[in-house]
Structures are given as C-alpha cells and as structure tokens.
Amino acid sequence: PESEIYNKSQVLYGLYQAKNEIIKNDCCFLVEGYTDVISLHHNNIKNTVASSGTSLTEGQIRMIKRFSNNIVILYDGDQAGINASFRGVDMILSAGLNVKVVIFPEGEDPDSYSHKLSTEDFKSYLEENQNDFITFKANLLLKKTKNDPINVSKTINDIITSISVIPDAVSR
C-alpha cells in the first residue's frame, strides 16, 4: 500500500542489489514484478529491476539513467504487458536513453519462462530476442493492420511519434 513513506512510483525493486551489475554490463533489464527480479537474479541475471507492478514513471527512468543509458524491457507476453511496453518505450526514449524490448511467448513472463529453460538457454533467449523499438512496434502494429492502408498509415505515424520524442537530433 502507498503511504508517505513508501510510494511505489518512486521505487525500483532490486535497484540496490542490481546497480553494480547495471554499471558493469551498461544495461538494465526492466521487468514488471518482484518475482521476475528474484527469478532473474537466481538465474545470475543480476542487472534486473522491477517497476513494482506500476506503470513506469519518469522518476524510475531517471534512477536507471544514473547507472546506464541502455534499458531492455522484459514485460509479460500478454496484451497488458505489450501495452505497458508501448507506453514505456516512448518515456524511455524521451529521457534520452536507448531501449530494446523482449517479448515472451503468449502467457509467459520472465519468471515463468526462466523456469522452463536452463540459465544458459534463457540468457540466449534474451540476447536473440531483443528488438529495437522500431522493430518491436512495427512487428506488433503491422500484425494488427492486416495490410489495411489506413491502419498502416497509423502504424507509421506511431513509429514517427516515438522517434520524434528522442531529444538528441543526431540519434533521432
């Protein structure tokens, strides 16, 4: 529960334990929940933090930015996780950070999927399935458009909007 002492939107679960690994790897894996952090740490993926089941906030992004400019979103493979990834991508980009996204199979999350694979196979899955934000959005949005020109146009506009929030003109 929220209180004057504890405000979930101001906390990244596991940050204290992960900060040295985030610096060492120059990358932060961002998950949704506590159990995801615990499972990934158990699998020796220690540069992992959670947004504590809340929508990602600018304050949380600033906390990560102190240690790395690279974030990989590992949200759940359900529609809610995909929607949260869409929202998070633009916020991370507008803070000037680099972002990639890993989508898990339908019905899986980092915790459940890490239990189905060996540690090495799970690490390989994370490496091989990281998509930059343009590829992530294009693949998902184009599946929805079904080659309808109006929907394709909306997809392109969505991607352009994401690019436009990048503060650095050269990166944009």
Per-segment meaning from a language model:
Residues Y34-T35, I45, G96, V102-F104:
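Alpha-helical interaction elements
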Residues N98-S171:
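C-terminal or mid-to-C-terminal helical accessory/interaction module adjacent to the motor/catalytic core
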Residues K19, K65, V89, D111, ...:
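Generic hydrophobic alpha-helical scaffold/packing signal
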Residues I61-I64, D90, E128-D132:
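Flexible glycine/proline-rich, aromatic-decorated loop/lid segments
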Residues F67-S68, V89-M91, K116-K123:
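Short, hinge-like loop/turn segments at secondary-structure boundaries
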Residues P1-F67, I71, A84-S85:
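Phosphate-handling DNA/RNA-contact segment within nucleic-acid enzymes
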Residues T35, L56, Y75-S85, I103, ...:
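Acidic, metal-coordinating catalytic cores used for nucleic-acid/nucleotide bond scission
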Residues A84-A95:
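Conserved acidic, small-residue-rich alpha-beta core segments centered on
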